[in-house]
Amino acid sequence: HLSLRRQRQMCIRDSDNVCHVVGKDILRFHAIYWPIMLMALDIPIRFKLYVHGWILTKDGKMSKSKGNAVYPMDLIDRFGIDAVRYYLAKELPLGNDGLFSYERFIERYNFELANDLGNLVSRSISMINKYCDGVVPNKDIVKSGEYEQSLCEVANKAITKTIACFDKFRIQDGIGETWQLIKRANKYIDETAPWVLAKDDNKREELASVMYHLAESLRIIAILIAPYLVAVSYTHLRAHET
């Protein structure tokens, strides 16, 4: 149990990092009543409010009586918590209501998580295992050509813009910026065709350079997706360390 004095000290010290995540229907309690109480206690008002909308279905608000309620645990049991977290982050933008439908959920799961991200991770890791014995090549052998420069530009842009979006709680936009890098990395595989380079002994260094750029892309992506794809990010960052 924290004393009132201790709570006050923590509130003042950490208030710049405090964010209230609330639904729009209880905004007044956090935007009006809570600041009044802080002012009465002479505590600075420096917290942030992240106010999200409602999660709707095509029939409107979810209701048990209507029989259109979606139970999160059922989704988590079937698809995993990361997939549910990703969908909500993508479909519930700041300041607006979000729409949930099983069709839309499956579409995002298949096309974005499985096809875009999943294929990139699977292809990259399998090629690093096959062509480099599972060891990421040393940075010293890296060569930078037209494709590598383009990939690096997209990566740097994704880092800057994703962080900027997240700092402003524009989670949906931040995810979109990260996905630009994911799509570019997938394109990089097609452009460089590592399976062709692997057939030519004179292209070993070029192949190693491609593998390095793919591994580095995965590392950056793993960091950027960490807020909403926690398990995926942790798994691949640990794999990268190993």
Report the location of each language-model feature.
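Single conserved hydrophobic/aromatic residue that forms the stacking wall/gate
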Residues: 1-8, 12, 236-239
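General helical secondary-structure elements
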Residues: 1-4, 81, 119
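Alpha-helical recognition segments enriched in aromatics with Gly/Pro capping
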Residues: 6-9, 13-102
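Flexible, glycine- and charge-enriched loops at secondary-structure boundaries
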Residues: 1, 27, 148, 204-207
